């Protein structure tokens, strides 16, 4: 039997050796930065891996602390298992460090450099093509002008798809695709652990709670977003979300009859003190806080979208094109875990409809939205983007059939679509369209229909819809939880993505701009631009917050401003 003292020294020796290796490889990376033959992309990848090694070092430190017992044998029981786990992690870490040292010497891979040069050349050739074709158009008239313009747009589409395909393959080279898969999975598991920990306190009678009533006066997508908003505030204020859903207008039995409960251990909203939301600080000593709808919450908490957690921001920016949407998707993912009967319904519907890939999801919202919140869009506007998406997919996979999942509240649309586009295979359930009508909307059958529509839309390879629709935005959010980065897998005919009642959506100017027309606004690098909308023509609308002027500006001259907030990190969730 070895005494603990010797083992503890052994642990400390391992940690010291670990730290020395980290210091060595860190210095090695810094020195290598001076060599011109190393790309900044490769260096960023390696530094990120080094950051993960540091995180593993912290994990080892915590493991060593958990092993620190005053006396007694360690060759059996839990302590022995932890020591063995420590040894395994140490050996893996040594192997990883050696691999990363080799990568810094080798530089980017051959495929990476071939693709990078192909994209560079493609961009140049596109510019040459544009210059040449526009000069030709100047000298054409009438039918000849129309014919040449059509050919020009068709060729331009080929150029764009060629560059986009090269960019896709570039994103997969040198292990980048595998890294992205793993990093997205790790981030998702981390957040889901934290949410699960918060939602399942050991003693419900003592837990701080945030009460959210689901029955906001709107449809399913809107109500789901209302609960997501509540959930984010609960997460930020370290309160267990208590969801009140009795007599829900879609299912009188409540949320739990359709989806899994938001908590397994704490479904009772009672507490020693109760009050309405008056701000995180003022509510500090109130056990149960009732939250109003986002439109009337005051003071506004900092945890509203489009902000993301400070401790995850750097990792999210690297792995995902729209971190704010990814963050929303994590709460949606937790909330819509189906009950067994619903899971079975989804499986049966998948087989019955013949849903399989490749497939484009199309959502056409009509009825109450048209004229009130959105314009009418004929099916032709959707299929333009559907065809573009299929042509892009065909460059990297076999498209045996052009499948389109059509979700709509207009029962007549399916027949119209099949008549106008016989080369497409439309997958749709017209009974869902009938149940989505205004007279049938708030029924359990309608709820089943909208859940199925959202599920299949989120499963599609691309999504074509109007972001003015909550159903479309929910499908897009779920899509983000299914892929490492599906932020670009959409075409919206109207709005950009937004979350109802959020904090401002801002961008930062990276290039100067002098207006050429009366409707444009000037910009200087560093100016904050508040986004008001996007016309999908290269010129969004926004306000220059420094000048107070509203107008159009070139989208390529700005970048997204990622808003971060100091969310709690719930270290207890990892124990």
From Swiss-Prot:
It is an enzyme of class 2 (transferase). Its EC number is 2.4.1.68. Signal peptide: none annotated. GO terms for molecular function: alpha-(1->6)-fucosyltransferase activity; glycoprotein 6-alpha-L-fucosyltransferase activity; glycosyltransferase activity; SH3 domain binding. Optimum pH is 7. The chain crosses the membrane at residues 10-30. The keyword Mitochondrion does not apply. Highest expression in brain. A motif (SH3-binding) lies at residues 299-305. This is Alpha-(1,6)-fucosyltransferase. It comes from Sus scrofa (Pig). The gene is FUT8.
